[in-house]
Amino acid sequence: MTDDLTYIVTPDPVPTGPQLWEVTNTGTHHSHHVILNRIPDDVTAADIVADFGSLFSGTPPAGEPLVAQFTYVGYVALQSGGYTTWNAFNLAPGTYAVICFIIDPATGEPHVLNGMVTTFTVA
């Protein structure tokens, strides 16, 4: 997690099975958390930003929102800049997304609307 609102997920692809993630907020200006979801294989980070943009604007997308197709996998607690946590996950093969919903005090918007979402593959 960084001040420019990005996640860096390594290695690529992430291996399947039980694992321990080191999650570090390398930034100094923003606190972040991680919401880890399994997502449909064809969904992109841009799709997720657009879907949540519709939901947060008060105009839900036509039909079922994309988030209804997500499967919650885990959470990494709120971290201030410069801190590291260790988190255990057991991941099956597929496509995943890490998303931050912390509100930016300057804009009043959640970080996801500023692009803080990364998709990755577990294989």
Regions found by a protein language model. Give the residues of each.
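Extracellular/periplasmic metallocenter environments
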Residues: 2-6, 11-16, 22-34, 70-123
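Contiguous segments within soluble domain cores/interaction surfaces
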Residues: 18, 25-59
